[in-house]
Amino acid sequence: MQSQRIPGRKRGRPSLHSTPMKMAVHNLYSASAGSLPAVKIPKKRGRKPGYKIKSRVLMTPLALSPPRSTPEPDLSSIPQDAATVPSLAAPQALTVCLYINKQANAGPYLERKKVQQLPEHFGPERPSAVLQQAVQACIDCAHQQKLVFSLVKQGYGGEMVSVSASFDGKQHLRSLPVVNSIGYVLRFLAKLCRSLLCDDLFSHQPFPRGCSASEKVQEKEEGRMESVKTVTTEEYLVNPVGMNRYSVDTSASTFNHRGSLHPSSSLYCKRQNSGDSHLGGGPAATAGGPRTSPMSSGGPSAPGLRPPASSPKRNTTSLEGNRCASSPSQDAQDARRPRSRNPSAWTVEDVVWFVKDADPQALGPHVELFRKHEIDGNALLLLKSDMVMKYLGLKLGPALKLCYHIDKLKQAKF
């Protein structure tokens, strides 16, 4: 029986032990049945393949890696808690409180009554929310929301915060730029207020109580300046009449010579012809003093002098004659001016006038050369310094001055 077991054993799985080990195994099989459990132990150990053990060893770090990675933040959160919590809480702690100066100058675009109705401050809130409230307040306080709405800068991306305005029968929306810091809010509002001509309207610090008194003083000064402006404009409008009244003394002596009547007296004569009945006894009686006493008392007067109420036709004819006598020089000067502003259409006489008018001292003595060489507008634009010095005989200084005026003429818009 034992010989039959041994060849059967060979037909099975080959043993990994040496020949002495085979003999030991043979002795174990030949032993009693009670020793059979001890024989099974090496069989179980031998059946375990090596690759299975290695695979388990390799699988253990893979299986343990997730739990090792998950507790790492828990362990690292203890020393990093002081650094991570402020970084997470920084956006929450970033708030702005914007104060409104109700005593500031509202400017021409904002309505002062509506500015007075605004709250004392906006916030403390997120910078984007405070910016939206401030810009919306400017739009709501505007006389014309369309003008203020057009001054708001368009923003893109990020946290979309928009303002609205109603004009042209529609509701318009515009998104504000992305807010990154408190300084950006202040710079944005400073530019907006500068364009609205209402500086010092917003601030991140509360305004002192004493600013109202200073603003009142400024308002008083502004009122005084406005009154001064109105007075000056009224004086400017009324001044010509007053000047003509006081200029009667100077023009009274010129009544004797109709050809040399002062131009200021013509306006005064017009005023007399319009029907001032209280000056019928002689216009100079109110302002002339002793010079006009012979006229008012009926004494001898200069030939051709008549009260304006009695001879308005003669006064008008004399005024027209005086205008014609005093205007020939001006008309002649206007006639000499070029008819067209385009120099390419100028004639020789127009070029002569231009050269003489550009620099009378340096170029005035040389105007006859332009007439002699028949230089018109097109030829004038083609002149250069070397040509002027060579053909016209001008020195370097006048030639450079002439070229300078020609360059300015080329750059001008016709």
Swiss-Prot record:
Q: Which UniProt keywords apply?
A: Nucleus, Phosphoprotein, Repressor, Transcription, Transcription regulation
Note the coiled coil stretches, chain numbering: none
UniProt GO MF annotations: chromatin binding; histone binding
Q: Which cysteines are joined by disulfide bonds?
A: none
Q: Where is the composition biased (Polar residues)?
A: 257-276, 312-332
GO cellular component terms, A-Z: nucleus
Please give the biological process terms from Gene Ontology that the record holds: negative regulation of DNA-templated transcription
Q: Which stretches does UniProt call biased (Low complexity)? A: 284-304
Question: Where in the numbering of this chain does the SAM domain appear?
Answer: 288-354
Cross-referenced SUPFAM superfamilies? SAM/Pointed domain
This protein's name: Sex comb on midleg-like protein 4
